Amino acid sequence: QVYSRTEASASELASRLGVPFVTSLDEVCTDADIYLVMVKDAVLQELIPDVVKGREEALFVHTAGSMPMDVWQDCACRYGVRYPMQTLSKSREVDFASVSFFVEANGEPELEVLKELAASLSDKVYEATSAQRTYLHMAAVFACNFANHMYALSAHLLEKNGLPFGAMLPLIDETARKVHGLHPRN
């Protein structure tokens, strides 16, 4: 089952997964073993009490890199994090087999479930504490968001001077390929 506040988002994901969807938290089933909560970091904490209510014995998992695992501790008995370190866009397909997943849980049985869940998508599964994940998320912002900002500045500079940004793509691609074999400082 998929829940989203908007029918468009709920129906799109539910259709891809072949499951029903709901747009009210009151309609979310109460007998699932795991609730995977994938929302913007800013709304996670306010949503938690309503998501957990009536489902306290289930395993609750969020996917936020910058939010600690313990956001669940006042409401849920079993909880954790399954963080896919990847930039995600609705308009682009992601090959999850190549994505690194970082997991953390408040108990060993829960951790094993999260490892298995992540391993069903990728063989790049790592344990990381909330503190480690904070630095991981910060490093990801540097590697991805800052790079994208630099691309935007580059595109603006080129377009302003009548040059195509596409001319930069071979350089960008080679730079990205090099980091697979050389340390970034090289």
Predicted region positions:
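Residues at the starts of beta-strands that form the adenosine-phosphate
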Residues: Q1, R78, K124
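Conserved SAM-binding loop
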Residues: V2, L36-V37, V103
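Short, intrinsically disordered, charge-balanced linker/junction segments flanking boundaries
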Residues: Q1, G181-N186
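Rossmann-like NAD(P)(H) cofactor-binding subdomain of soluble oxidoreductases
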Residues: E7-A10, R16-V94
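Internal alpha-helical scaffold of NAD(P)-dependent oxidoreductase catalytic cores
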Residues: R5, S9-R16, E93-H180
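A structural preference for short, hydrophobic beta-strand core positions in alpha/beta folds
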Residues: V2, F21-T23, E127
